[in-house]
C-alpha cells in the first residue's frame, strides 16, 4: 500500500497536547524505497493547536511500520498514541472483524485438482514468499496461481469464491512482522480452506483453533509443510479436523481477538483519550473522591471499578478482604453485569451461531495494558499478587473481556 497519512478528525483541547504529536496514522508497505520512507511528511489542515509531523529516520528496507513506530513509542520519542496493526500499540488497527468477513460461512466441496491457490501480485516483497511458492511446487504441491507472480490461471475471478474449492490457500504476506495479518489470511478462513502462511511469526495467535493453520516460518520448513499438505489431502478425516472449528465454533482466544474490532478503532481512540482525560481530572484536588476502602468489623471492603473492553463507563465492584482473589472478582463481575442485564458490545457483530446466551469471562486485567498483554501474556500468578495489586492501587480499575 502507498505511503499514507490520515487525519484524526477529533478536536482535543490544546492544553492536553503540549509537546505531543498525535493525530497522524501512517502505514507503509515493506517494499517502499528507503528514500521515500525517509521523506518527512508534514501536514497541517487548520489545526492551530498542534503540529502533525512524522519523520521516518529509522527506516530499514527489511523493516515495516512496526519497526519504525514502536521503538519511538517505547523510547519516549514524542508520540503519545500509536495506532498500527500491532497488538502492542495503544489502539490496534487490525484487518479483522466479524462485519467485514463472513468467517463462519459454510465449507464448500473441494473440486479443484490443484491442492492450493495463490493470489500474489507484488513480486518484490521483502520476505521469501516467492521462494516458498517455488519450493512447494518442487515438493510436488500443485498450485493454481491467479496473481501477477507465477500466474498460470486467469486472475479475473472472485477471490473468496475461487478459494472455496481448494484444500489450501497460500496466505503469503509481503513481510513477516508480528501481528501483521491481512485479508489474505482472513479470506482463507471465510472460504473454508486451510491457510498456509508465510508472514507473522505469531500467526498461531490468530488461528481459529489449534491445528487450523500451516506455518512456513523459514525456508527450511517448506519441505515439512509440503509433506503435511500431502498427508492432509490424502486423509480426509485428518483434513476435516483442520476445519472442525467451522462446525463447532472457533476458540475463545480467537473470538476474544476478533471481538475487539466490534468497536471501530476511531471509537477506541476516543475511549483512550477520554480515559486519560478522566484520570487527569481524578488527580485534581478539586475532584470529588469516593472512598476506595472501608472497614466492616474485622474485614476491609475494597472498592474497585470494572468496564467491558471497548466501553468507557466503569461499574463499581466491592471485594472483601477475606476473599480477595481474582476468582472472587470474576464472580462479582458476572453477578453485577448479569444484574444490569448487560449485552456484550460484540453481540450484534458476531455470527449468531457463536454468540452464546450467557456471559462468560475470558480475561480480566488492569486498565492500561496493551491488547497483546491482555490477551496473551498478562496474568496474576496467584492470590498474593492479586491482593498486592489491589492494596497498592486504591480504587483499582480493570477491563473485562466477555466471550
Regions inferred by a protein language model and the residue ranges of each:
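Pol beta-like nucleotidyltransferase catalytic core
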Residues: 1-32, 36-50, 56-58, 62, ...
Amino acid at each position: 500500500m502507498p505511503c499514507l497519512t490520515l487525519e484524526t478528525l477529533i478536536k482535543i483541547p490544546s492544553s492536553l497536547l503540549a509537546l505531543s504529536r498525535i493525530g497522524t496514522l501512517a502505514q507503509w508497505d515493506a517494499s517502499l524505497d528507503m528514500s521515500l520512507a525517509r521523506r518527512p511528511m508534514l501536514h497541517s489542515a487548520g489545526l492551530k493547536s498542534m503540529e502533525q509531523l512524522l519523520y521516518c529516520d529509522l527506516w530499514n528496507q527489511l523493516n515495516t511500520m512496526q519497526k519504525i513506530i514502536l521503538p519511538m513509542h517505547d523510547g519516549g520519542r514524542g508520540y503519545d498514541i500509536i495506532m498500527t496493526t500491532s497488538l502492542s500499540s495503544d489502539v490496534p488497527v487490525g484487518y479483522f472483524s466479524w462485519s467485514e468477513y463472513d468467517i463462519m460461512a459454510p465449507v464448500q466441496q473441494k473440486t479443484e485438482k490443484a491442492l492450493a491457490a495463490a493470489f500474489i501480485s507484488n513480486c518484490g516483497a521483502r520476505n521469501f514468499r516467492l521462494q516458498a511458492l517455488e519450493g512447494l511446487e518442487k515438493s510436488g504441491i500443485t498450485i493454481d496461481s491467479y496473481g501477477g507472480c507465477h500466474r498460470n490461471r486467469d486472475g479475473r475471478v472472485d477471490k473468496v469464491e475461487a478459494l472455496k474449492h481448494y484444500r489450501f490457500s497460500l496466505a503469503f504476506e509481503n513481510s513477516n512482522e508480528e501481528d501483521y495479518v491481512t485479508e489474505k489470511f482472513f479470506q482463507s478462513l471465510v472460504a473454508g480452506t486451510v491457510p498456509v502462511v508465510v508472514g507473522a511469526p505469531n500467526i498461531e495467535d490468530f488461528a481459529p483453533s489449534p491445528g487450523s493453520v500451516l506455518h512456513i516460518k523459514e525456508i527450511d520448513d517448506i519441505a515439512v509443510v509440503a509433506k503435511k499438505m500431502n498427508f492432509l489431502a490424502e486423509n480426509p478425516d485428518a483434513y476435516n479436523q483442520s476445519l472442525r472449528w467451522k462446525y463447532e465454533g472457533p476458540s475463545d482466544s480467537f473470538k476474544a481477538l476478533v471481538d475487539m474490532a466490534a468497536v471501530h478503532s476511531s471509537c477506541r481512540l476516543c475511549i483512550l483519550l477520554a480515559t486519560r482525560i478522566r484520570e487527569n481530572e481524578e488527580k485534581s484536588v478539586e475532584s470529588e473522591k469516593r472512598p476506595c476502602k472501608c472497614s466492616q468489623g474485622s474485614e476491609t471492603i475494597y472498592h474497585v471499578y470494572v468496564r467491558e473492553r471497548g466501553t468507557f463507563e466503569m461499574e463499581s465492584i466491592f471485594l472483601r478482604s477475606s476473599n480477595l482473589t481474582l476468582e472472587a472478582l470474576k464472580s462479582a463481575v458476572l453477578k453485577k453485569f448479569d444484574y444490569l442485564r448487560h449485552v456484550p458490545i460484540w453481540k450484534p457483530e458476531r455470527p449468531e451461531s457463536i454468540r452464546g446466551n450467557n456471559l462468560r469471562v475470558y480475561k480480566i486485567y488492569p486498565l492500561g495494558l496493551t491488547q497483546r498483554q491482555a490477551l496473551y501474556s498478562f496474568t496474576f500468578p496467584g492470590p498474593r499478587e492479586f491482593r498486592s495489586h489491589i492494596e497498592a492501587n486504591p480504587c483499582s480499575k480493570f477491563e473485562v473481556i466477555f466471550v
